Swiss-Prot record:
EC category: ligase
BP terms from Gene Ontology: glutaminyl-tRNAGln biosynthesis via transamidation; regulation of translational fidelity; translation
EC number per UniProt: 6.3.5.-
Molecular function GO labels: asparaginyl-tRNA synthase (glutamine-hydrolyzing) activity; ATP binding; glutaminyl-tRNA synthase (glutamine-hydrolyzing) activity
Gene: gatC
Family stated for the protein in its record: Belongs to the GatC family.
Subunit and partners: Heterotrimer of A, B and C subunits.
Protein name: Aspartyl/glutamyl-tRNA(Asn/Gln) amidotransferase subunit C
Organism: Afipia carboxidovorans (strain ATCC 49405 / DSM 1227 / KCTC 32145 / OM5) (Oligotropha carboxidovorans)
InterPro entries xref list: Asp/Glu-ADT_sf_sub_c (IPR036113), GatC (IPR003837)
Length: 95
């Protein structure tokens, strides 16, 4: 598969990128090089290779899922210019 100048202009238009006429040949070459590399990757034999998400084995640290109030509600509300009944008080915007 190869990209022509019209396709480069179409991609630029869809991406809302301004591309000058003199830039089109360079971008066309870049896109064709990327597509050639992707085609080269598709030829690699991956039969029997386990899929992985990272080259380094990683595990997420797990914690107990406990519902709490965050333990800092008073500190958070202390930053508010106005509060009422432990809630932020904001100006009315809709009548």
């Amino acid at each position: 598969m190869s990209v022509d100048a019209a396709t480069v202009r179409r991609i630029a238009q869809l991406a809302r990128i301004a591309v000058k006429d003199e830039e089109v040949p360079h971008l066309q070459g870049e896109l064709n090089a990327m597509l050639a590399f992707i085609e080269q990757l598709s030829e690699v034999d991956i039969e029997g290779v386990e899929p992985m998400t990272s080259v380094i084995p990683m595990e997420m640290k797990k914690r107990q899922d406990v519902v709490n109030d965050g333990e800092i509600a008073d500190l958070v509300l202390a930053n508010a210019p106005a509060t009422e009944d432990h809630f932020f008080l904001v100006p009315k915007v809709v009548e």
